[in-house]
Amino acid sequence: MLTVPGLCWLCRMPLALGHWGICSVCSRAARTDKTLCPQCGLPATHSHLPCGRCLQKPPPWQRLVTVADYAPPLSLLIHQLKFSRRSEIASALSRLLLLEVLHARRTTGLQLPDRIISVPLWQRRHWRRGFNQSDLLCQPLSRWLHCQWDSEAITRTRATATQHFLSARLRRRNLKNAFRLELPVQGRHMVIVDDVVTTGSTVAEIAQLLLRNGAATVQVWCLCRTL
């Protein structure tokens, strides 16, 4: 997918503001039309009430905000961001996430956070890639929402196996005690930002760490939730 300055990257129509990257029509079209549970982000009957899964076994976070399923066109843009070093895509993707957050605030009273945090990469992977995609999403979000962000709020204590090929049970085991909190969060309303949430094992481990250290609430914001 070629990105052309001044044109929408998806429909190729001229942009009113060239740096946005994605036009308002495509931004609206990128959103999922499925009814999602406000807590786990999976398909549900109601978008304002927790689903049966969350009532029986709630995740360790209170809200999950997502733009869409992990499918084209968003999946293609995320892949380019992560693996083709197209860091200019990050701002446009952050804007899509911002619009979804503001929509949730208008329609469901979503609470804005005191601080947002990135899902960290292991040092070697960060060095190889040259950036952490979660950092690139957090940076403009923190500026637009006037909340705190520190790229080193959470660090990885060890290397972990690639999650993609692991079952949900092995993912949880793989991530056990893999993160360390580097700053106080007592009484703070926290948001974990990631590009894609699949089983939720990574964000669940971080959410549990935040809650153990006194965070008042934890939300998860992601571009894509595997539905």
UniProtKB/Swiss-Prot annotation:
Family matches, as Pfam families: Pribosyltran
Similarity section: Belongs to the ComF/GntX family.
Function: Could be involved in gluconate metabolism.
Protein name as it appears in the record: DNA utilization protein YhgH
Gene3D superfamilies (alphabetical): 3.40.50.2020
